[in-house]
Regions:
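A common structural junction motif
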Residues: 231-232, 319-329, 380-389
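Conserved PLP-enzyme active-site core in the AAT-like
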Residues: 2, 18, 74-273, 278, ...
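N-terminal "arm"/small-domain region of PLP-dependent enzymes with the aminotransferase-like
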Residues: 2-54, 60-63
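PLP-dependent enzyme catalytic core of the Aspartate aminotransferase-like
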Residues: 120, 138, 253, 310, ...
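Short, well-ordered beta-strand elements within core beta-sheets of diverse protein domains
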Residues: 243-252, 299-307, 362-366
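Conserved N-terminal alpha-helix of the aminotransferase class I/II PLP-enzyme fold
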Residues: 35-84, 89, 105-112
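Conserved small-domain helix->loop->beta segment predominantly found in fold-type I
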Residues: 262-320, 324-326, 346-352, 392
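C-terminal core of ALDH-fold dehydrogenases
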Residues: 11-26, 310-350
Length: 392
């Protein structure tokens, strides 16, 4: 049987780089070399300079390509490096259509950087396919999706957007950071470029900064590789190894965290101090049916809204287990405040249009015991002053 005959959870451990061919080592070797000797003037090897490629980076790139069902993977120094390099496929005068509630770093890249180079943009609610259709312009070249979106967990109908894109000869990019190929495989649904902040669930231990891109079309892969090599924001070999190590436990981490996320979302929904919960695993989430159709789970990230910033401050000071920090997707639960963290680059009026209020918190659930997390949040919520609890 070939590697592709196994389920993804088995492929995470038993892939093409299960053992080193020259030594039998069961861990991918870390090749700390900036340059590579060529055996003769007329016989150059596969590798020449480490910006262009290394055996360790190749192992990660080939592994993520296989997991996503693509033909080529590319590893970058961060998630934003991967996204920025993908946007280099655009030229002056092109237009990109972007999901409205997008990660703050992507928002900044589009509004403050791409616009300086004559690349136009429009933000639309991609949970509404009619808005997507209406947002298409004659110069639209890329439709950029996040699903679930960050931080309000909006769900986009991937196949619906892909169909619109094909009708207008557009490429589709999708940030798959929240779900990973363990729960969602966008290339199988027709997406052209899948992007990841591998800093998050793929590596899973808050100890590496990394980005990945995967494509199915070989010509597009060649174009992206040329941009990767030219732009130069590549991933170092030590970090490649850390991501490869993290991938081995992706399935078990994500399964555990997703189950706890559902339990916490259900608990938070019933607590009187919580105004609203955003989690696509809840049956009353507006995108729940689409999520079940295109993904095998709802993931381990949820958001919830309290009365105001004062309530947020009290809760953050009151919980014990989650770390209060930027980022997500780690073994430890991470509580974040989008208004001052992931979406700090977004003006307040733009945030509020997207439902990112001063009372919104995002929780990336870790692998702790679910009952312990529930008890921790309960005691913190129960201690909120009456004036900070929604009275409606």
């Amino acid at each position: 049987m070939t590697t592709h005959d196994w389920t993804l959870e088995t492929q995470l451990v038993h892939n093409a780089f299960k053992t080193d061919r020259s030594t039998g080592a069961v861990s991918v070797p870390i090749q700390h070399a900036s340059t590579f000797h060529q055996s003769s003037f007329d016989d150059f090897g596969q590798y020449d300079y480490s910006r262009s490629g290394t055996p360790t980076r190749q192992a990660l790139e080939d592994t993520i390509a296989a997991l996503e069902g693509g033909t080529r993977g590319l590893a970058f120094a961060s998630g934003m490096a991967a996204i920025s390099t993908a946007f280099l496929l655009l030229s002056k005068g092109d237009h990109v259509l972007v999901t409205r509630d997008v990660y703050g770093g992507t928002f900044r890249m589009i509004t403050q950087v791409l616009s300086r180079f004559g690349i136009e943009h429009t933000f639309v609610d991609m949970t509404n396919l009619n808005e997507v259709k209406q947002g298409i312009q004659s110069n639209t070249k890329v439709i950029y999706m996040e699903t679930p979106s960050n931080p309000t967990l909006g769900i986009t109908d991937i196949e619906g957007v892909v169909q619109i894109a094909k009708e207008h000869d557009c490429l589709t990019f999708l940030d798959n950071t929240f779900l990973t190929p363990a729960l969602q495989r966008p290339l199988d649904l027709g997406v052209d470029v899948v992007l990841h902040s591998a800093t998050k669930f793929l590596s899973g231990h808050s100890d590496v900064l990394s980005g990945l891109a995967v494509v199915k079309d070989e010509k597009l892969g060649d174009e992206l590789y040329s941009l990767q090599n030219s732009f130069g924001a590549v991933l170092g070999v030590q970090d490649c190894w850390l991501v490869l190590r993290g991938l081995k436990t992706l399935q078990v981490r994500l399964e555990k965290a997703s189950q706890t996320a559902l339990e916490l979302a259900s608990f938070l929904k019933e607590h009187p101090a919580v105004k609203k919960v955003y989690y696509p695993g809840l049956n009353d989430h507006p995108g729940a049916d689409i999520q079940r159709k295109q993904a095998s789970g709802a993931g381990a990230v949820l958001s919830f809204e309290l009365e105001n910033q004062a309530a947020v401050k009290e809760l953050v000071d009151g919980v014990t287990l989650p770390v209060f920090a930027v980022s997500l997707g780690a073994v430890e639960s991470i509580l974040s405040y989008p208004a001052k963290m992931s979406h700090a680059a977004m003006p307040k009026e733009e945030r509020e249009k997207r439902g990112i209020t001063d009372g919104l918190l995002r929780l990336s659930v870790g692998v702790e015991n679910g009952e312990d997390l529930k008890r921790d949040f309960k005691q913190a919520l129960d201690q909120l002053k009456p004036a900070l609890v929604n009275q409606s």
